[in-house]
Amino acid sequence: MSDYKNTLNLPETGFPMRGDLAKREPDMLKRWYEQDLYGIIRTAKKGKKTFILHDGPPYANGNIHIGHSVNKILKDIIVKAKGMSGYDSPYIPGWDCHGLPIELKVEQLIGKPGEKVSAAEFRAACRKYAAEQVEGQKKDFIRLGVLGDWDHPYLTMDFKTEANIIRALSKIIDNAHLHKGAKPVHWCTDCGSSLAEAEVEYYDKTSPSIDVRFNAVDVATVSAKFGAANANGPISLVIWTTTPWTLPANRAISLNAEYNYQLVQVEGECLILAEDLVESVMKRAGIAEWTVLGSCKGSDLELLRFNHPFMGFDVPAILGDHVTLDAGTGAVHTAPGHGPDDFVIGQKYGLEVANPVGPNGCYLAGTYPTLDGLFVFKANDVIVELLREKGALLKVEKLVHSYPCCWRHKTPIIFRATPQWFISMDQKGLRKQSLEEIKGVQWIPDWGQARIETMVANRPDWCISRQRTWGVPMSLFVHKETEALHPRSTELMEEVAKRVEQDGIQAWWDLDPAEILGADAADYVKVPDTLDVWFDSGSTHSSVVDARPEFGGHSPDMYLEGSDQHRGWFMSSLMIATAMKGKAPYRQVLTHGFTVDGQGRKMSKSIGNTISPQDVMNKLGGDILRLWVASTDYTGEIAVSDEILKRSADSYRRIRNTARFLLANLNGFDPALHQVKPEEMVVVDRWAVGRAQAAQAEIMEAYENYDFHLVVQRLMQFCSVEMGSFYLDIIKDRQYTAKGDSVARRSCQTALFHIAEALVRWMAPIMSFTADEIWNEMPGERPQYVFTEEWYDGLFGLAGDESMNDTFWAELLKVRGEVNKVLEQARSDKRIGGSLEAAVTLFATPELAARLNSLQDELRFVLLTSAAKVADYADAGDDALQSELISGLKITFNKADGEKCPRCWHYTQDIGLVAEHAELCGRCVTNVAGDGEERKYA
């Protein structure tokens, strides 16, 4: 028996079946870096239309976690896809480098500034620590396959950026948005500093819930308001609070003007309560019997006076819309120094903004004899007892409620009025203008717009000052007496900025005011405050994007971060850009959800359900992590577990196997020499290229809409269904057995070449490492990297008016599927081994029969059987199986006649007709010794 193996066109490629990504990817990264891939892309894209995705800077502290990976991979997919769409999309990664977390880490290492080290030494240590953290995170981000200018990232602690942050504040001052005031701000007693809204988290806390009597100063006047002449005993207005520690700062009681209030007689006294809450208060206080003596509106009680229960002065009743009937008594204890609503209503009534609490959370001396020096949360119980002694406590309970806490320390925070600098939301119309700007931005998902609109509409003025050591100085001079800003503030700030640009922020603390103030130095002092770090990152659209030449003066197109950044970076950037330039800093804002485990639980070290991106890359590879990110609908929670990653690895293998089949069967194909013209190609080959064209249109649209999970779904469908289970299956016979340089084979290779050219580009933004690997195995002259390319424009399809158009092949796929069911059952019943042992008969209605017969003898190649014939539907016997999908089709099969050809494995009756090749079928003889078979359709 002759060996005809060397007459076959067997697949051959250097592209391995196993990805072995964890081992191969680091070598690719080394090559990318040594060859300056990022620089090559920039050169290739120069002069194209620009798309700027501005990187929201992660904080330079600690290792990257799985959430960081999601964020950076999504950004990288977009940047690479934009490159494929013909954009120049420079990507400059950044880091947020100032602020408290770094201070706390450095304190642990060298102690607090002013104790063991000077402030200057402390800042230098912070700078060094932040730089080390940046380097550690940078390595992990690069390992993800993220392309960017990693050698020249932006750091908020770069001298030039620090200087530009000062210039941003100067512009805001120039536009009259800055003011100073003693306002209640979120204050962490552990940090000893005010907190931005984005630095506040909410956790459950148990607090005392108390109802407190404020006795009326003039009982007769109050009784008269209710029309009650028969009131017995003292009259008190009852407030409800869960923060007894704020009572020393009480300066009023707020009522709602429109609510009805009742004077209620109980044993020995009268209580004033909101009509709708009387029953709940009585139940809470354990009072079974009461009598309503009269009613009046809240507005009738305005400015009546009530005695503070222990501070020795009286306070007015005032009116405010913030009073609700959700809980309590309908009367709200009002301390303008300890709450934003209280402050606003206090301003309206000219109330004192009292703040008896120091930065450490302890009462100042002179507050109250038993409270001086006491920590506020410890004072709650002392105040409850004090109220009990004074006869002012109506009821005390414990309440578990959601309470604001410091994001770093996880400890409860307080509202505390301190002298601070604010960007005003309303004095120059910043709120109104910001709300207008929001409308011009595309929010992805679209619910992001309503979310940030609500936040902007309701947010207080932004407290931008901090009492910290490691931060950008506000760089302000104020008058010693009046505390007014120096009239030449913007000019002076530019002088400071120039010094900072040379020497960093330490230049401010080293500055002798006389150097730039001259004679004014006698009357003005430096403001010691630093800027909120959210101002640092929020101004990068100006301090970085406007300043770096590679952005070419273009403003950012997109900001992309987690959904918590509506109140963080998106908000601070919007406020600063609108205050500086009168416009939003972005055109599109895309948000992604948070990572959770396979059961939907938040990632937590205590639960033990965290997944380290480093571990995933070391075990499975970066492309598996990237494919997982792309496969997930990032608009909601993003689930990750070992099982989910295993599914991503399975999907990856299917895609890789498809790519490997394409490459292996392009062996010996030179596109410059061997391409077949579309009109001369076998019809099914043109159909396959057309399916790639249709897939590409959908994939390009999905990339354009940032629907990466749809990209992956379409890619998988193309590889598994249209290619894997149909086209790649039926071409094996022609590809392997046809004459090597025949049109039949070269037509097939031409199709595979076009498909591979398209496929590698579809993959590149997501599976970047594998796309690069495929690109290097592709035949023909080509640029060095796929990442410099655009979507493949060499695809073509079948004409719609051809008889064998897409509709024809879609029907044929169904027919083949129905035949496969019959053959699968036969295999299961051990009646045949492989499908080539079968000869099938398709009983079809006339129209379907005509379409099937148009394939002539090549129908069998589509069905992967040794023989196939079409008969009249009416002639089908009882043994014919009715198709479930196609009403006009019945199927039977028999064992194929003849012998098995050892070369093509088809069963045929023409083996041995040519003496020189006595073992071969006639078709194989033609392919081995003749001109080669002709194929028209399949």
Swiss-Prot record:
<comment type="subunit">
    <text>Monomer.</text>
</comment>
<dbReference type="GO" id="GO:0000049">
    <property type="term" value="F:tRNA binding"/>
</dbReference>
<dbReference type="InterPro" id="IPR002300">
    <property type="entry name" value="aa-tRNA-synth_Ia"/>
</dbReference>
<dbReference type="GO" id="GO:0006428">
    <property type="term" value="P:isoleucyl-tRNA aminoacylation"/>
</dbReference>
<dbReference type="InterPro" id="IPR010663">
    <property type="entry name" value="Znf_FPG/IleRS"/>
</dbReference>
<feature type="binding site">
    <location>
        <position position="561"/>
    </location>
    <ligand>
        <name>L-isoleucyl-5'-AMP</name>
    </ligand>
</feature>
<keyword id="KW-0479">Metal-binding</keyword>
<comment type="similarity">
    <text>Belongs to the class-I aminoacyl-tRNA synthetase family. IleS type 1 subfamily.</text>
</comment>
<protein>
    <recommendedName>
        <fullName>Isoleucine--tRNA ligase</fullName>
        <ecNumber>6.1.1.5</ecNumber>
    </recommendedName>
</protein>
<dbReference type="InterPro" id="IPR009080">
    <property type="entry name" value="tRNAsynth_Ia_anticodon-bd"/>
</dbReference>
<keyword id="KW-0067">ATP-binding</keyword>
<feature type="binding site">
    <location>
        <position position="605"/>
    </location>
    <ligand>
        <name>ATP</name>
    </ligand>
</feature>
<dbReference type="InterPro" id="IPR023585">
    <property type="entry name" value="Ile-tRNA-ligase_type1"/>
</dbReference>
<dbReference type="InterPro" id="IPR050081">
    <property type="entry name" value="Ile-tRNA_ligase"/>
</dbReference>
<dbReference type="InterPro" id="IPR033708">
    <property type="entry name" value="Anticodon_Ile_BEm"/>
</dbReference>
<feature type="short sequence motif" description="'HIGH' region">
    <location>
        <begin position="58"/>
        <end position="68"/>
    </location>
</feature>
<dbReference type="InterPro" id="IPR014729">
    <property type="entry name" value="Rossmann-like_a/b/a_fold"/>
</dbReference>
<dbReference type="InterPro" id="IPR002301">
    <property type="entry name" value="Ile-tRNA-ligase"/>
</dbReference>
<dbReference type="GO" id="GO:0008270">
    <property type="term" value="F:zinc ion binding"/>
</dbReference>
<keyword id="KW-0862">Zinc</keyword>
<dbReference type="GO" id="GO:0002161">
    <property type="term" value="F:aminoacyl-tRNA deacylase activity"/>
</dbReference>
<keyword id="KW-0648">Protein biosynthesis</keyword>
<dbReference type="InterPro" id="IPR013155">
    <property type="entry name" value="M/V/L/I-tRNA-synth_anticd-bd"/>
</dbReference>
<dbReference type="Pfam" id="PF06827">
    <property type="entry name" value="zf-FPG_IleRS"/>
</dbReference>
<keyword id="KW-0963">Cytoplasm</keyword>
<keyword id="KW-0436">Ligase</keyword>
<dbReference type="GO" id="GO:0005524">
    <property type="term" value="F:ATP binding"/>
</dbReference>
<feature type="binding site">
    <location>
        <position position="904"/>
    </location>
    <ligand>
        <name>Zn(2+)</name>
    </ligand>
</feature>
<dbReference type="InterPro" id="IPR009008">
    <property type="entry name" value="Val/Leu/Ile-tRNA-synth_edit"/>
</dbReference>
<dbReference type="InterPro" id="IPR001412">
    <property type="entry name" value="aa-tRNA-synth_I_CS"/>
</dbReference>
<dbReference type="GO" id="GO:0004822">
    <property type="term" value="F:isoleucine-tRNA ligase activity"/>
</dbReference>
<feature type="binding site">
    <location>
        <position position="901"/>
    </location>
    <ligand>
        <name>Zn(2+)</name>
    </ligand>
</feature>
<keyword id="KW-0030">Aminoacyl-tRNA synthetase</keyword>
<keyword id="KW-0547">Nucleotide-binding</keyword>
<feature type="binding site">
    <location>
        <position position="921"/>
    </location>
    <ligand>
        <name>Zn(2+)</name>
    </ligand>
</feature>
<feature type="binding site">
    <location>
        <position position="924"/>
    </location>
    <ligand>
        <name>Zn(2+)</name>
    </ligand>
</feature>
<dbReference type="Pfam" id="PF00133">
    <property type="entry name" value="tRNA-synt_1"/>
</dbReference>
<dbReference type="GO" id="GO:0005829">
    <property type="term" value="C:cytosol"/>
</dbReference>
<comment type="function">
    <text>Catalyzes the attachment of isoleucine to tRNA(Ile). As IleRS can inadvertently accommodate and process structurally similar amino acids such as valine, to avoid such errors it has two additional distinct tRNA(Ile)-dependent editing activities. One activity is designated as 'pretransfer' editing and involves the hydrolysis of activated Val-AMP. The other activity is designated 'posttransfer' editing and involves deacylation of mischarged Val-tRNA(Ile).</text>
</comment>
<dbReference type="Pfam" id="PF08264">
    <property type="entry name" value="Anticodon_1"/>
</dbReference>
<feature type="short sequence motif" description="'KMSKS' region">
    <location>
        <begin position="602"/>
        <end position="606"/>
    </location>
</feature>
